[in-house]
Amino acid sequence: MTTEEFEKKAESGKLILVDFFATWCGPCQMMTPIIEKIKEKYEKDEKAEVLTIDIDENPAIPARFSVMSVPSFVYIKDGKAVDTVIGATTEDNLVDRIEKLKK
């Protein structure tokens, strides 16, 4: 995903959960099936979307949100970070935050 594509989504009015990851990161690999499941759950949701950003492929996006470690999960609404989870976590934690923040 290019920075331009990301900006368009970030400014869309939807709540965006961004999974910042790296291919060399063990905890990131552990989170992949959880993120895929959440991504599928919100695929048709008009108020929320899940994106994954490889920090090595596009370092400008994580830099914008001061991402210093992976995995990091940043919730973005109207182009601004509204919540962050750093490190591996549970599906329930990520989904509960989506539901709370997308309203």
Model region roles, listed by residue range:
Residues 1-15, 59:
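A short beta-strand-turn-helix
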Residues 14, 21-24, 69:
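Short pre-active-site segment immediately N-terminal to redox-active cysteine/selenocysteine motifs
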Residues 17-18, 50, 73:
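Hydrophobic beta-strand anchors of alpha/beta hydrolase catalytic cores
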Residues 25-28, 73:
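The canonical Cys-X-X-Cys-His
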Residues 29-44:
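Typically the conserved alpha-helix immediately C-terminal to a functionally engaged Cys/Sec
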Residues 53-61:
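Structural microenvironment flanking redox-active thiols in thiol-disulfide oxidoreductases
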Residues 65-74:
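Structural micro-motif
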Residues 74-103:
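Non-catalytic, surface beta->alpha helical segment in thiol-disulfide oxidoreductase systems
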